[in-house]
């Protein structure tokens, strides 16, 4: 984890902009709507707290797939003079017997405690201190460490020169296609970070005769990656077609292409031109799906829009799905 002051990238944390060019695309509409999860909690005598905290540190905190670092683990019950402690998420352990076995392992003899799995807590911290205080009262006491998105921005690893090179590649081809009179000057560049020289550059297939309406540049690119796998070009094949790929687009993708990128498990998408009527990444585009960061889906990917004017693209009708 790099400290903000040591980050080589210039980041505007308030507006989510990196190096004055990459605008972070996230579903900020839902970020302050708590996604509640069930956790295991235990009510104990304060004298037993040391052993329980040791169990949390040595087991639950290390192995729980859900980070609960934004929670205060302990809250006091003044009326009963007991402590209520959050142990772990039910995603980590769903069986009550397993929890009891772990608790029994830290005590000699029989101990009385109340175990519960009906406590609901926010899975993620809110973006403001005011909401943090409100959720602490309504759900469970939280720790305020600042806006969580600041850390997300700070953790991005981005080679700006590589981004420029690939966007320039896509832009040049798109302009060339438009100059040649092609109706769909959309371009996608698929880059496997582990094989950067062996990239896939895909033009929109709808410019060709006998094409299908779904032959968008993204779909053509994914298909090309699949063909390489089938032909044995990529020997280290994964179960997902484009696992951890970086994808560079001339135009904001439509819902079909955005979902195809979800299914392909790409890592990052960078696009040049937003499509206000048909796009599916920005909250202000299309129906506001924000497909890359939608809580209803089981996967996400990073998304950015290049907000500089260095890389022109071929223009398309605003109702065209890209």
UniProtKB/Swiss-Prot annotation:
Heterodimer with TAD2. Residues 162-283 form the CMP/dCMP-type deaminase domain. Disulfide bonds: none annotated. One of its GO terms (cellular component) is nucleus. GO terms for biological process: tRNA modification; tRNA wobble adenosine to inosine editing. It comes from Saccharomyces cerevisiae (strain ATCC 204508 / S288c) (Baker's yeast). It comes from the Eukaryota. Keywords: Cytoplasm, Nucleus, Peroxisome, tRNA processing. Zn(2+) binds at residues 216, 254, 257, 322. InterPro entries: CMP_dCMP_dom, Cytidine_deaminase-like. Coiled coil: none annotated. It is found in: Cytoplasm; Nucleus; Peroxisome. Pfam families: dCMP_cyt_deam_1. GO terms for molecular function: tRNA-specific adenosine deaminase activity. SUPFAM superfamilies: Cytidine deaminase-like. Structural subunit of tRNA-specific adenosine deaminase, which deaminates adenosine-34 (the first, also called wobble position of the anticodon) to inosine in many tRNAs. Inosine-34 allows the decoding of 3 different nucleotides at the third position of mRNA codons, as inosine is able to pair with U, C, and A. The gene is TAD3. PROSITE patterns: CYT_DCMP_DEAMINASES_2. This is tRNA-specific adenosine deaminase subunit TAD3. Present with 892 molecules/cell in log phase SD medium. The keyword Cytoplasm applies. Belongs to the cytidine and deoxycytidylate deaminase family. ADAT3 subfamily.
